[in-house]
Amino acid sequence: MSGQSAFSLEDRRSSFGLNSFALKCIALITMIIDHVGAILYPEVGGLRIIGRIAFPIYAFLVTEGFYHTKNVKKYMLRLLLFAIVSEIPFDLALTGQILEFGHQNVFFTLFAGLLLMELYSRQTSSAGRLICILAVTTLGDLIRSDYGAWGILIIFCFYVFRENIWLKMLVVSGIHIFAFGSVQSFAVLACIPIALYNGEKGANIKYAFYGIYPLHLLVLYMIKQAM
């Protein structure tokens, strides 16, 4: 990406800030709180408000992962694999059915966002780039991935405006407020930890973070069955 922002990643590298591991922890905790609310206590709206913080952070981290991974294809395959593995736990926890195709888990959205960045980066023409955006976002809506086309566009906005922290925060916040509205507007709170990102990696236990997603859904499903 060309251009310089007032505050680049290098400028924000300091002892004060959040590394990638810390952001993952925040996203994970807020996601679990959100799912506790959605699955066990839907009447407690505050849990869902806290949970709105999770997706923008995951979207941001996928964009950073795209830039830092040594192998984008393996990264995409990993996201797709966990999307498939997580679908039954996701459907059981949210609908009580083994497979329900009306709503797919967020790993499909993250995969689609990564796919869009990879395809877009390979295009040299405006027409080719536009086709990539339309094709992948349409795919997201067709398979009914979590957050749909807008979720994919949020990931893409973090990619396009990566070097301008204020612009990407403004655009992503605008999407959450105007495209989703209501409770989802509280996703703008995710801008705070994202703005504190210092560009550093931190502890590397990515498979643990991936594995917790289907496992916590299964645990919540079993708790719901026992209640």
Please describe what each predicted stretch is.
Residues 1-227:
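Alpha-helical transmembrane segments and their immediate juxtamembrane cytosolic regions
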